[in-house]
Amino acid sequence: MPAEKKRGERKMQILQVIAEMLQDPKGERITTALLAKKLDVSEAALYRHFASKAQMFEGLIEFIEQSVFGVINKIVADEDNALKQIHAILSMLLGFAERNPGMVRVLIGDALVNENERLQLRINQLHDRVEATLKQCLRVAATQGHEETDPAARANLMLSYVVGRWQQFAKSGFKRPPSELWEKQWPMLV
């Protein structure tokens, strides 16, 4: 097996173990010592793949960004009805959290406490991008004959709803799914 492929696989393995550790409802802080122990490698071996723990979290954030915005772009490209776009985007965000509970702790900033502040800034940017997409969809919805509301306020409400559901999921020890009551609450958001 080529060394580059092996190196890439080890990087992915490290990120997967971090994501698994983040799923622990106790929410213990992830240290490189604990991570190395779980992987049965030395801390030095971790640093051969990532220059810092912050870089490991950046790898998780990149995965989240690629996953979320890959699907959002597909939804916007494939669906003409703006309200259906919004519903699909919000459903995807809630579903992504259910399928990736460890990532929720990154998305709400829980796992980033006491880490490099640029990580939280990057998550804030991700939230801002999602909100901007929702705002644009709401503007398009107004041109399609749907009730015209303040797109900025409505987009902020929608994102706040999603982040609140993520927060509730994490704080419940991943017992209360983000999509719980979603279809009943959707009409209240639009």
Model-inferred region functions:
Residues 1-38, 55:
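Basic, helix-initiating cap at the start of DNA-binding domains
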Residues 59, 73-99, 151-158:
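Hydrophobic alpha-helical connector segments
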Residues 66-69, 73, 117-143, 152-156, ...:
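Amphipathic alpha-helical packing segments from all-alpha helical-bundle domains
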Residues 22-25, 31-32, 43, 53, ...:
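Amphipathic alpha-helical segments enriched in hydrophobic/aromatic and basic residues
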Residues 97-118:
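Amphipathic alpha-helical segments used for helix-helix packing
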Residues 1, 95, 99, 132-140, ...:
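C-terminal peripheral helix-coil segments that are non-catalytic and often amphipathic
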